[in-house]
Structures are given as structure tokens and as C-alpha cells.
Amino acid sequence: MAKKILLVDDAAFMRKMIKDTLSKNGYTELFEAVDGADAVEKFSEIGPDLVIMDITMPNMDGLEALKAIRAKDSSANVVMCSAMGQESMVMGAVRSGAKDFIVKPFKPDRVLKTVSTILGNP
């Protein structure tokens, strides 16, 4: 069965970039959310195997959404990403249960390595 991946970013072009990278490499069950609140709702609906989520978003930021998702499912696989590669953000995400952290701008190889490490190959 194909692994489901939820892509969360308020910037449509960032979601598209990750989606294109993953779909070209065999990941086909890709879903999108536009902010943290949307991510929490879609997480409940879809039950994704992995969430790749931006930190800085309107309505509910990625760290709050991470906490809400982990409260629903303590074993949820969430990878945080942000242009802010600051240590405090990374540590906050890890303390809140993130499996990994990717810094923007993305390198496709880094995204694929992170996804395959967590989910295995498509």
C-alpha cells in the first residue's frame, strides 16, 4: 500500500516543489494543507504516514500543529521545515516530537533522504 504524505505550507509554490520532488520519485499519495489548523484537520481525516510541515504559517504555526498532531497520535511522523534554520526552532521542534528538520531552500536529495529514512522507499 502506498504511503500517505501530508504537505503543509502556506506557500503554494513550496508545497508544489515538495510534491513534484516526491511524485517524480514514486510517492503518489500526496495531500496538502495550507496552515497548521488545516493540517490538524486533514491529519485526522487522512491518517498520513508522514507530515512535512512548515513552521511559520498563519492561523496556527507548525509547532502548535505538531503538538496537536502528536496529542492525537503520539507515534505520528512529522518533519518540520522552515527558512529559519535557527537552533532554537530546531530544538523546539525536536522537543515537541519532530522526527527531523529540513531547512529551506530545499535540496531535493535531502527531502528524499529524509522521507525514505522515515518511510522506506515508495
Where are these regions (language model features)?
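Two-component/phosphorelay signaling modules centered on CheY-like receiver
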Residues: A12-F31
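Acidic catalytic/metal-coordinating carboxylates
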Residues: D35-D38, D61-E64
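Active-site beta3 strand of CheY-like receiver
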Residues: I46-I52
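Receiver (REC) domain active-site loop signature in two-component systems and cognate sites
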Residues: M57
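Short, conserved "switch-loop" micro-motifs in signal-transduction and mechanochemical regulators
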Residues: M84-G85
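C-terminal output helix
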Residues: S88, F106-S116
